[in-house]
């Protein structure tokens, strides 16, 4: 099962790899209690190429942690496992959950996002590529 959300530009309220508001935490707990996934160790946060702006979030139930993944403890009952390939793009992101008369959705407030598409489903981040390094020549 995947959980989708909308991306918002802006600054999160906390400085962390990834954080969740109380409303997001409450909703994630409800979903996890409803699904009862065997051997679930938390939620895996990742990104994939999709949408007008290039990237969107993936949030799935995790049954194992990969070697370079980062574990963030959102609550004593919830671990967020950040996929190593997504780490630079999501550092500082805060996940929120809103309920309005016409929609209920998760929102990701990502300080690294430089652009979002019109519907907010996808985003672009700063370029984190490492420039070519010029090493000194050995004599």
From Swiss-Prot:
Chief location: mitochondrion
A GO-annotated cellular component: mitochondrion
Entry keyword Cell division: no
SUPFAM superfamilies named among the record's database cross-references: HesB-like domain
Binding site for Fe cation: 52, 117, 119
Single GO BP term: iron-sulfur cluster assembly
Subcellular location: Mitochondrion
Gene Ontology MF term list: 2 iron, 2 sulfur cluster binding; metal ion binding
Keyword annotations: Iron, Iron-sulfur, Metal-binding, Mitochondrion, Transit peptide
Role: Involved in the assembly of mitochondrial iron-sulfur proteins. Probably involved in the binding of an intermediate of Fe/S cluster assembly.
Family: Belongs to the HesB/IscA family.
Xref: NCBIfam families: iron-sulfur cluster assembly accessory protein (TIGR00049)
The protein's name in its UniProt record: Iron-sulfur cluster assembly 1 homolog, mitochondrial
Organism the protein comes from: Dictyostelium discoideum
